[in-house]
Amino acid sequence: MNNTVLILKKISKHYKQGNTIVKVLDDLNLTANEGELIAIIGSSGSGKSTLLHIAGLLDKPTNGQVIIPNSKYKKYHLIRLYYLGFIYQQHHLLKDFTALENVIIPRLIRGLDQKEAIRDATKILDDLGLEKKLYNMPGELSGGEQQRVAIARSLINKPRIILADEPTGNLDPKSTNEVFNLFLKVAQKQNTTVIMVTHNHELAHKMDKLYNLKNGLLNIA
């Protein structure tokens, strides 16, 4: 039986708009297990990114609990650092750092050994097909290659959970499938849980579970 790595319990997120209360998320529940691949689809403005921000402890719900079972850390910034990885549509690579340097930054922030970080980053970049691009600057890489570097960066700390918000949204169809398949391969190799928000239904159907976010609730799609 898989270990549970994330529980969203009765999550609500409400905003005040004039005299009206807008319910973006409304008593929502989600359980994610170790190694699971979960996709969340929904129309624009349905609250997908809000849900991901709450799951990633980047935003607080109006009501409800975000539970990381068996976490030895209580402070949110430590949970994010040690247990969570993030991938966004915009990769936010540092332009004056090589691909390899961009990937090892999260490991160095934790004060871990640089040689070990370089070794692990090199292996992940190799798994993502970038073994010949380690010392290239981001400006020398294609859009797909830049996104693979961002994916490698999210994986370097071997997070329990990766939260991906439209991770291939800026790529052409060929690059999208190539990057996404490599991403899933490496995530599964590390037994990392992936929760991905996407508008791409083809990618969504490659995941273990598919949910549709509508009217503030998650429904099995």
Curated annotation (Swiss-Prot):
Topological category with respect to the lipid bilayer: Peripheral membrane protein
Keywords recorded for this protein, A-Z: ATP-binding, Cell inner membrane, Cell membrane, Membrane, Nucleotide-binding, Translocase, Transport
Subcellular location: Cell inner membrane
Entry annotated with the keyword Methyltransferase: no
Pfam families linked: ABC_tran
Chief place where the protein resides: membrane
SUPFAM superfamilies found in the cross-reference section: P-loop containing nucleoside triphosphate hydrolases
Residues in ABC transporter domain copies: 6-220
Span of the signal peptide: none
Domain of life: Bacteria
GO molecular function terms noted in the UniProt entry: ATP binding; ATP hydrolysis activity
Residues bound to ATP: 42-49
Gene Ontology annotations for the cellular component aspect, listed alphabetically: plasma membrane
EC number assigned by the record: 7.6.2.-
Function: Part of the ABC transporter complex LolCDE involved in the translocation of mature outer membrane-directed lipoproteins, from the inner membrane to the periplasmic chaperone, LolA. Responsible for the formation of the LolA-lipoprotein complex in an ATP-dependent manner.
Assembly information from the UniProt record: The complex is composed of two ATP-binding proteins (LolD) and two transmembrane proteins (LolC and LolE).
Entry's family note: Belongs to the ABC transporter superfamily. Lipoprotein translocase (TC 3.A.1.125) family.
Protein name stated in the entry: Lipoprotein-releasing system ATP-binding protein LolD
Lineage of origin: Bacteria, Pseudomonadati, Pseudomonadota, Alphaproteobacteria, Rickettsiales
